[in-house]
Amino acid sequence: MQRAASAFAVGDFRKSEELCKAALSMRSDHLEALSLLGILNARAGRVEEAAVLLARVVQAAPINAVAHNNYGNILRDLRRFDAALASYDRAVKLEPAYAEAHHNRGRLLSELNRADEALSSYDSALKLKPNYAEAYYSRGVLLHELKRLEEAAANYQQAIAINPQLADSHYNLGNVLRDLRRYAEARQSYDNALAVKPGFAQAYNNRGNVLQELGRYEDALRSYEHALAINPDLAEAHINSGNVLQELKRPDEALGSYRRALRLKPGSELLLGGYLHTKTLICDWSGVEGETAELHRRIAQGRLAAWPLTVLALIDDPALHRQIAELSAKGDDPVNRLLPPIIGHAHHDKIRIGYYSADYCNHATAYLAAGLFECHDRAAFHLVAFSFGPDKRDAMRDRLSTAFDQFIDVRAKSDREVAQLSRNLEIDIAVDLKGFTRDARPGIFAQRAAPIQVSYLGYPGTMGARYIDYIIADETVIPAKSRPHFTEKVVYMPDSYQINDEKREIGEAVSRLSLGLPVSAFVFCCFNSCYKITSSVFDCWMRILTRTPGSVLWLLGDNATAATNLRKAAEAHGVDSRRLIFAPHIPVAQHLARLRAADLFIDTLPYNAHTTASDALWAGVPVLTRCGESFAARVAASLLINIGLQELITTTEAQYEEMAVRLARQPSLLAEVKSKLLKNRRTSPLFDTKRFCRHIEDAYTQMYSRFCAGMDAEDFRVQKRKQAQ
């Protein structure tokens, strides 16, 4: 048996097995041979055979702690957890100083979600064997699962200090550092893991993820390529390649990556949604109807098949929107919160408002809300901006950095650290301006950054989260029939929920000729992102063009592939593709100026124009919308009601088509609508920033008064003020 043990030690498992069998052929009850052969069978995946062998050892040597420990390992592999725990308990009872048995017992208890007992077992193992690297590693894994990130990192670091050759410790340390948003350190940990284990595909994959977070997209792509060279079937690396290719504005290649991932692992979280979003981004509608039905089915089954924002653009169903939001919020649920509940929060004469966003720069949210931040009554409110987006030094960033009492860059802080900072600053009301949009940080609010937490502006739907108390809305975007589909208490603004900045600059006038538009044609436009253009919307647009000879459709040139696909689709409808004209992205003031060259903005469904509708109305261009069921499908209607253009709200495709054709065919009707718009633009609530600011301050005051009185959050309506004060 010494030769068998030696062969095992050097990795010659075949030789070791032969020698064990030879020993057993001479003596069938040879315990050492039975034990080692059981371990060899387990290593080879023959777990049932291993269990039989190790059971014989335990029966023959009932007071052998090692035998009970080994048998416990096999029972754990067989998922016979109660029996496994009994074996480990027997092992440590027989030999209380048996560190390995304490460690294995801890691993099993961790699997059983008995975290406190598992930690106690790990502590026992480490007390007995202070340089037990594997126990520190296992303790780190459990602490990571418990979201005790700093402690997890310390345990992985201790394991590495004892044994620098543990690749998994380097790798998992990288994962914790990534979660702590310490991306450069995380990358170094992945590099360390790869130095120990060059063929570690998952380490290359996660290394790519942190490089992506650092904005090093080409480097991230190369890291994913390394992962796939090692393991071409690693679905996560295909998915992440798709994500980074999206960032690199290479949607065609991204689609290919998602397709490969779907073949390998079709049920991956978020994958079907990411694939569909990419298809709609390039206006590739082939198979989308069936794929959307499958997405709906998966969400209805309780599967996180898409990011909530993706679903808003595909399916007009408020109940489904709530379901996908709740599934998304589950990962940040308060049960995972580490910070204790807020107790004894100080009351302030000035209400302390925290606005949380990644978009304090040239971004749609900033264009809308800049005036709000500047108009707040500083005698009654103290404003703090928490910025977790890139530090883009543009004109809007410069403007916003002076619009708050405090402007804090929290990019490098973890969700828990941001929440703790908010508590230290005694923020009364935390306003999430992101929701489930790009670069969102819902984990901050799951940690309860403030006693009152509000969803506003960024995400047009419910967050589905117990930690969000209120949503700012209006009677149009959340009508009574939709109220059951929102988990938040609803604050109904007296006018539109959407803030607008009355200071927005419109550039110098530009001619149609300079924009590549026909001088005398009727110009329909839609500057929504391409993913909002569905095949049914485009079909309707083509019927409108067919019925209005000589008209053109002016669209945003999101990407070349989308333009190509839309031109092909136009030709398939018998419409000359030259009647589709694509505009490049340009600075906002110039964009507002060029918008005036259009005659009519025609909206999309189920995801309406939001900021783009406000842009058009501010520029004096009427917006024709079709109002749907969900928040995202009703925003343009809210805007039109509050600028006095209800006649441009339709509820069916036929109404929408007929109104577009009428406005194109009847110049006097269009002129009347435009005249009304220009008159109302300066007098209606929609572009009265100060009036809106006073109303939302009234909302904040009522929220805070309820909190100070010990009352729970409830729906309420903000009373309309006659004029800004």
Protein language model features and the residues they cover:
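Short beta-strand->loop
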Residues: 527-528, 556, 626
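Substrate-binding clefts and catalytic carboxylate motifs of secreted carbohydrate-active enzymes
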Residues: 525-536
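A conserved nucleotide-sugar
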Residues: 380-382, 542-572
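Donor-sugar nucleotide-binding helix/loop cap in glycosyltransferases
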Residues: 602, 616
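Alpha-helical solenoid repeat scaffolds of the TPR/TPR-like class and their adjacent stem/linker regions
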Residues: 1-518, 529, 539, 567-576, ...
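Conserved hydrophobic helix-helix packing surfaces used for dimerization/oligomerization
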Residues: 351-355, 524, 553
